[in-house]
Amino acid sequence: MNFFIKSCFLDKEKTDCIVVSVFELSELSDSAIYLDKCSNGHITSLIKLGDIQGKIGDTLMLYKVPKILSKRILLVGCGKKDEINIIRFKKILKNTIHAIKKKSIKNIVYSFSNINIDNIYWMIRRMVLSLKESLYETIKINNTNIKNTNIHSITLNIIKKNDLFIAKTALKHALAIDHAITSTKNLSNLPPNICNPLYLSYKAQELSKKYENNIVVEIIDIKKMKELGMNAYIAVGNGSKNKPFMSVIKYSGNNIVNKKIIAFVGKGLTFDSGGISIKPALHMHEMKYDMCGAAAVYGTLIMAAELQLPLTVIGILSGCENMVGSHSFRPGDVLTTMSGQTVEILNTDAEGRLVLCDSLTYLERFSPDIVIDVATLTGACVTALGESVSGLFSNNEELSNQLLHASQETDDKIWSLPLFSEYHKELNSDIADFSNIGRGKAGAITAACFLSKFTKKYNWAHLDIAGTAWKSGKKSGATGRPVELLCQFLLNQSNYIYN
């Protein structure tokens, strides 16, 4: 499906459907008024019949409107003009797709005027991403994938010609971000017998082939891990026949404007049984999503390469599988991490932090200025923040504020939680430097405190996405979060200006 930006006369557009907005009390938008005048009041006369009130959720399809070349006009209710926000705007766009996608409509022109939720850049970007999200379908493995829509192209009409350049920039960014989000979802949704640590390494290597001028990939296998002393990482994978692989993706942009080295680390547990501290059976199938952090890093690197961002970005996919076996690590074991610090294992289901701690230490060789790890780390974060908000932890206030700003811009909600010294005491151990879990309270915080012990040499932030990375139930699947937030963070680091 293709997107286009242009400024056009709506009555002259030969298309299958034009979409325009209508507000409560049957108030027409400027685009709807234009079409109404061109059709000698035809739209107004139909609205007076009472078939659309202009409330959010209302839609009315008009056919063969006089003096209009489009085959159809879709009127979309937008509620009260002064009460439209980002959430309502997304719902409005979803309603348009619901009204269109099952019909034989191939080409659409959107002309949304009088909706002032943001400047033209954000308006266009939100439209494209929301429409793309509404049309996304999880790839099935049963060879019966059916095309869910007939839509071939969507044109966004820009009322003011002076806005065309900014609108085209917004479209370019939106399509790159959507590519990142879709790639993240598709990877996350794969079953664990397909997507294992080796498969993650293959996906990383594909990037070096597709973006060969900007991306170099190094794969750290178990032999190399042993040489590096990554004993915590190795221990987690010992119970599985699928050996761990850590994929290191190095992106170097052209004409770099920001000399900082930015690194992302993604937890890539392609399946987490919990190990000997085994998980309950009921929802264990969802533990294929325990690699959503790695998938998010993978997607974010795609966006950087697509837009040729003038940055240096490193992405680590920490691929591993936590299974029960005769070689599994045990509660009571003491592991020496790559950093030299020792960890007493009290629970083998607190494994993500063990994979991440060695990955974070490995990153030191690149002397990064900023490191952000992304992980479906703790159920405690879901208990604290629910399924709408991700947890944020950081050892640097400026970095934390930058991520919070990107969160506000993208409406991908995160909330900052503390790393006070009192919480570190929860990890005390009698026989090691510290244990891998606390005593049951503030689990999301103590997990972040654990990670912070391996991040002393750079500015670091941790995003716990355990509640936001996927949805359960009837429409289950990966959400693609927090990819847009991470992409926006990189765009901001690139000094892009939005007018």
Curated annotation (Swiss-Prot):
What HAMAP family is this protein classified in?
Answer: Cytosol_peptidase_M17
Instruction: Supply the SUPFAM superfamilies for this chain.
Output: Macro domain-like, Zn-dependent exopeptidases
Q: Which InterPro entries match?
A: Leucine_aapep/pepB (IPR011356), Macro_dom-like (IPR043472), Peptidase_M17_C (IPR000819), Peptidase_M17_leu_NH2_pept (IPR023042), Peptidase_M17_N (IPR008283)
* Substrates-to-products reaction catalysed: Release of an N-terminal amino acid, Xaa-|-Yaa-, in which Xaa is preferably Leu, but may be other amino acids including Pro although not Arg or Lys, and Yaa may be Pro. Amino acid amides and methyl esters are also readily hydrolyzed, but rates on arylamides are exceedingly low; Release of an N-terminal amino acid, preferentially leucine, but not glutamic or aspartic acids
- Which EC number(s) does the record attach to this protein? 3.4.11.1, 3.4.11.10
**Cofactor or coenzyme needed:** Mn(2+)
Q: Does the keyword Cell cycle apply?
A: no
Positions bound to Mn(2+) 1? 272, 349, 351
Task: Tell me which positions the record assigns to the signal sequence.
Answer: none
Cofactor binding remark = Binds 2 manganese ions per subunit.
Please report which protein family the annotation says this sequence is part of. Belongs to the peptidase M17 family.
> What molecular functions are annotated in GO for this chain?
manganese ion binding; metalloaminopeptidase activity
What GO cellular component is one of the record's annotations?
cytoplasm
> Which GO biological-process labels does this protein carry?
proteolysis
> Which residues are involved in binding Mn(2+) 2?
267, 272, 290, 351
Record-given protein name:
Probable cytosol aminopeptidase
Q: Where in the cell is it found?
A: Cytoplasm
Main EC class of this protein?
hydrolase
State the protein's purpose: Presumably involved in the processing and regular turnover of intracellular proteins. Catalyzes the removal of unsubstituted N-terminal amino acids from various peptides.
The record's listing under Pfam families reads: Peptidase_M17 (PF00883), Peptidase_M17_N (PF02789)
**What is the organism lineage in this UniProt record?**
Bacteria, Pseudomonadati, Pseudomonadota, Gammaproteobacteria, Enterobacterales
Q: Which residues are annotated as active site?
A: 279, 353
Is Manganese set as a keyword in this record?
yes
Record organism: Buchnera aphidicola subsp. Acyrthosiphon pisum (strain 5A)
